[in-house]
């Protein structure tokens, strides 16, 4: 993260279907930067949280409602259709594995995001899930292969090695941009904004810690 980005490298985009912020950024990037060389990488958000000893935003009670309201507001501002699912958090593994099994194409990612965040449906709704599988020409057995599971695990290991701690995160070279709030910053970097070669930008990653909070 402390190195200048490589403007010619593809943008690795780490995401999990569990994240409403990933859904929102996916649509923003498609609309605002259709020529961006985006390389989507599905990862299990819970594994990132466990590795970095962190909590997701909806695991903090006062933050939970705010998170959903904020997402709805962002969707409204950007003209993105959004409907909260029947429950959240939920188990995203079937969605992640289905995306990998079907080649992780933009069309597949679009449809799976829409299933949850446009239509408000979940993988644990058996009838709805079967309809989705039928629509995509997929079978439950495709989600359960060793190859699919190994790919998802490898994606997570790759994300952690890159320093990814949350979703969505975009990597432009070694520079990481976390969250839908960083979309404008990401696009500026990808466009070669000189800020990302500045001494002040570099200093942000070398700032000393003055005080460490004690944890019980």
Language-model regions, residue ranges each:
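Structural alpha/beta surface segment adjacent to cysteine/selenocysteine redox centers
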Residues: 21-116, 200-216
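Short beta-strand/turn micro-motifs composed of small residues
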Residues: 15
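C-terminal cap of thioredoxin/glutaredoxin-like
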Residues: 4, 9-10, 18, 22-36, ...
